[in-house]
């Protein structure tokens, strides 16, 4: 089930644009300035802008490192802004998984074990070791936009040689089902406000989520990162690397139905 989770998440939650250049943890770290930016309203307004496209189709190659052999996956991702994210995955010319996310939740199936899931967003939250992902946060994560809850009270903005660093000055508290989780958050942005790196630390168990974005390109008024890398650090470390090869704004059909004889899998 964990392999199914990694496959589904990597396709449905982490693709954005096109061409290749690897994203690595050794990317230059911005040198933080000591003085906070006092007039930060323009910055917060810019990084929370909503996407304006109607739909985008993305072709991607996905490599997963999680201790098990998973071949390179070819993914087609289709996003209707604010409504749904659909994906289809193949490996070695064989269809291996398909899924769809909407504001109501996530549905997906995989053909190797003939299993499927039908869940709210607790599935992706469990996989990412967080608890604040809903549909809009998921779409923002896919597109390299700010996907964590932010406000100018709990964050400090500094400017540096590479752009900006937004750091939590107070622990970020997320309350879900009467359970409160606290995080520390640090986000790096380029000088033109493109997201470069996000690091979240769960203070209750020391789980960590890191997301890297690189090689941004503007296409018809929309900015997209060409490469994405995600690292999930818990009892073990999983890494997902995305090479996006093509995108366009055409509409496509997004069929989804679970084949006969597939077994529903409990969320773990």
Outline where the language-model segments fall:
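Edge/loop elements at the starts and ends of beta-strands within beta-rich repeat scaffolds
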Residues: 48-56, 68-71, 78-80, 99, ...
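Sec-dependent N-terminal signal peptides
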Residues: 5-12
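Gly/Pro-enriched, hydrophobic low-complexity segments
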Residues: 19, 154-261, 265-267
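C-terminal motif of bacterial Sec signal peptides marking the signal peptidase cleavage site
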Residues: 14-16
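Positively charged n-region of N-terminal signal peptides that target proteins for export
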Residues: 1-5, 19
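An acidic-aromatic
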Residues: 84-136
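C-terminal low-complexity, charged extensions that often adopt amphipathic alpha-helices
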Residues: 127-158
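N-terminal leader/targeting segments and the immediate start of mature chains
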Residues: 18-71, 263-268
